[in-house]
C-alpha cells in the first residue's frame, strides 16, 4: 500500500549561483559523506547537486516531515545502480525511524529538463511477515 508521495522541482540556475557563492561548503551541507566523491567527479556539479537536493526534499514531503531530525540531508544519500536507476540509502537514526513508521519499499525517479531538476518519491508500507 502506498503511504506517501512526494515531488520536488529545483531551479538548477539557483543551485549554480549558490555553488558560485559558497563553493564546496554549500555542497557539503546538502550531500551525505558518501555522495561527496561522486559530486567532485561530476562533469555537471550543479545538476548533480540539484537532483540530490530535489530527491531529499521529495522524500521529506512523502514522509510529511520536512527536512528535520531524523530526516536530514546527511542522513539520506542517493546512488545509482549499474543500469542508472537511482535509489536511496539511509544513515544514522533514519533507518530506525522509517522502520518505526512501517515504511517498507521506497521508489525514486529523477529527471531534468530546461534548467529544472525534478524528483518523485513513492513510499510503500512494510508488509507484515507471516509466521
Could you say what each language-model-derived stretch is?
Residues 1-131:
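Core catalytic alpha/beta fold that binds nucleotide/phospho-ligands
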